[in-house]
Amino acid sequence: MSASVQSWTDRLDGAQAADVSALLGRATAADGTAPVSEQGVHAVSGAGGDGVRHLVETDADRIVGYAQLQPGHGEHPAMAELAVDPEARGRGIGGRLVAEVLSAGGPDTRVWAHGNLPAAQAVAQRLGLTGARELLQLRRPLAGAELPELVVLEGISLRVYRGVEDDPEVLRVNAAAFAWHPEQGSWTEREMAERRAEAWFDPAGLFMAFATSDEKRLLGFHWTKVHPKQGDEPAIGEVYVVAIGPDAQGRGLGRLLTLAGLHYLRDRGLGAVLLYVEGDNASALHTYDRLGFERFHTDVAYARA
């Protein structure tokens, strides 16, 4: 067996990006969960991710392991994600990748384990890491399941996204609502444009709430998403982003906007819907529990103890 080699790069070339994308696909098929987030997938192709560094581990010129490191900014630590080719597992590649990104990213670096699979838990234990953040995936059925009636609150108007003219308000509310969030809170027009270019994008699935007294200042929005059928897995909807401006919270807008999206997804014929929520977001968890969502799996960000 030949010795594998690690190397860092600020940008993957075309062949590397294709090989990494294929590796991520194999890992997803083997594990039942994607090892890298949507933002990370964009960074692989070079479409996004300022400052992202890529670590590849090769064996005989074949990429057998991949990690990416998103630099820290302000109070937010550096974040890393990684994947090991299913055919190359059991050789310590995952542990080496984690050790290297922790060294490169600094003492507060966090490493995502999507699905928190047993192999990831074993690496974390071996390296003395502890869970620093949890991201929960919740799901609920749509087909054959009741949804509360959608009743628009008094003094509130709902409409859908009209195009780039809405972007400044969407980005303003997003930044304010997710100021604490190292990934979501840093969105710019580039992230908006990337998502508008995706095959799943549908302006009719982005719901926006305004006060009837001021229909230029956005109070909150709910962006839905549809994941297409993959193999035996049917298409599924997603509560992609729900953002409520700090000055509009506590008025029931989160529930209203979520329900608007759920009705839309059900009307499209989808059988189920998923969402992601921080494990310590008690308010959101309470809202989603009342709407019939249940925990499906957990992503854990590990850090040095």
Swiss-Prot record:
Acetyl-CoA 2 binds at residues 242-244, 249-255, 281-286. Keywords: Acyltransferase, Repeat, Transferase. GO terms for biological process: mycothiol biosynthetic process. GO terms for molecular function: mycothiol synthase activity; protein-N-terminal-alanine acetyltransferase activity. InterPro entries: Acyl_CoA_acyltransferase, GNAT_dom, MshD_Acetyltransferase, Mycothiol_AcTrfase. Residues 10-154, 156-305 form the N-acetyltransferase domain. Acetyl-CoA 1 binds at L82, A83, V84. It comes from the Bacteria. Belongs to the acetyltransferase family. MshD subfamily. This is Mycothiol acetyltransferase. The lineage of its organism: Bacteria, Bacillati, Actinomycetota, Actinomycetes, Mycobacteriales.
